[in-house]
Amino acid sequence: MNNAFSPFRRLLTVLLLCIFTLVSTPSQAERIYTLKFATLAPAGTTWVNMLQEWANEVERESRGRLLFKIYPGGVQGDEPDVLKKIRFGQLQGGAFTGYGIGQIYSPARVLELPFLFNSIEEIDYVREQFMPDIEQGYRDNGYELIGWMEVGFVYFFSKEPIQTLDDLKNRRIWNWQGDAMGKAFFDASGLSPVPLSIIDVYTSLSTGLIDTVYAPPLGAIAMQWFTKTRYITDIPMANGIGSLVVSRRFYQNLPQDLQKLLKRTGKITGEKLITATRRDNAEGLMVLQQRGMQIVAGHEDLKSGEVENISSRAAASLMNNGYIPKTVIDRVNGWLADYRAGKEQEPLDVPK
């Protein structure tokens, strides 16, 4: 009798195994994806707090299918280190400043050319025109642009007051090691900076290896550089850019609904970061003054003719080495000319 029922039992066993396999193996829709995401911004800053809010929103809306693991404070290394880890699959994304963006799609850094913009409105207008090119440039190089942000207008922070280029020539100025934009600016200004990883800046200010750095107010506060400097020169050199990025490979492996979720929430987060960064930089300047830092008025000659010369020389250098093609710079200058012809300008809110 047992032999008579053995084929049935074997069939039942196979069916049960199949059902168990189907139930225990999640479908693509149920699979959990983890986005390991790095940033130089220290924990507790506006930037990291808003990144965590983004991560929480994505986890909630995806019902736990897309999770973030955020690494703040440069624990995964400087931006070139993070990009290398993304290429090797150790990380899947990060928040980058212009330096890192330049290693993804260098033409985007046309938005950081020194002394290019006269107003916030100009920045927003030109960025909007150029954004489709930036997005495609990221894709062509293996990345997906998820959100755009800013770090804000960059100023010199120094241990001694700086009003002129001659003052700068007597200072030990930091330059972000390997940064083509910084090199172009300093070469155009006739300056010889000290190249260092951003991770080494605080220690180098403490030891006296450098005595001058450049940063937006919020960055100088977040990195604690302001504790080692006493003066801020009131000439904003450039508006520092930033972006939220994931590897193209990771993005394409996500189901379409998670791709759309990541893009939608990432764009909103970038917009929120721009608004918060502009606000916090303005408030940060007031806080720094309250803590005893002095705002130094730049010499008028530096603000006018010399500024234009530096900007032109830096742009020419970046065109000649192929970092930013001439066609890109020409297009941006064209957009600026169109905007300025049709809009009344508001001056930058330079601290006094």
Stretches found by the model and what they are:
Residues 1-8:
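N-terminal secretory signal peptides that target proteins for export/translocation
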Residues 22-30:
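Bacterial Sec-dependent signal peptides at the C-terminal "C-region" and cleavage site
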Residues 24, 134, 270-272:
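A short hydrophobic/aromatic micro-motif that marks alpha-helical segments and, especially, helix-coil
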Residues 29-122, 138-352:
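N-terminal secretory/targeting leader peptides
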Residues 124-137:
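Signature of the catalytic double-stranded beta-helix
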